[in-house]
Amino acid sequence: MANIFFKLKLLCKSIIFLKNWYVFPIVYFRLTKKPFVHFRIKSGPNLKIRTGKGSSDIHVFAEIWLDNVYLREFNLKKNSTIIDIGSHIGLFSILASRKFDNGKVYSFEPDKYNFEILSDNIQFNKINNILPFNFAVSNSNNFIKLYCDENDFAAHSIHKKTLDSIDVQSITLKNIFYNNNIVRCDLLKLDCEGAEYEILMNTPKEIFQKIYKICMETDHFTDEKKLNEIINQLHDFNFKTIKKQISNNMGYLYAWK
């Protein structure tokens, strides 16, 4: 019953947010054979998303644009600096670029196909405050293996081994700050299929001193011990934290100071 109410809530929100809201249920329930659709946000961008096998774009769109999972706990200024790790096709980066239009968004996505659509979405909407990078983020500045999930283009991972893999350039969070001369990050968003642990646990305190808010998905953590280690480290670095379960399969950690 709760799942039905959740879907009805998303449909109602799609009517509020989308000019072509009628496309949302068609894609959500996989009733179209078109490989792509464009969602036209009211007073906002057009967003290209995939609809076929292997695409969870519609669910990512619902989480980010309709349910506002990454920004719901925070108030940020218009000139905020955002780092988006695991930017997929750019849905959060574009939302952040519009809400904080005097700021800057550093967007990192390792998969070439996802990155192409991210770039299309940026160029089509003539957005100039997103800096996209076709990089993975990990504890390495070298090439690493990205394991591909043929059933979900949003679930490629450097940890969950599959038969299909590609070599991708990686960068550490520390080097993101140094290479881009970032002196302050108002929000660090992470959705990188389990790489959150090695990214955060290998980032020095001097970098955390420049970060003021963090939001990350927690559903990838089958080992609760690792998530607790992250939380304890954030507490050591003067962050307050809260875990929230948004739905049965959507959990998030919010941190701020």
What do these predicted ranges mean?
Residues 1-257:
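Phosphate/nucleotide-binding beta-alpha loop and adjacent structural elements of enzyme active sites
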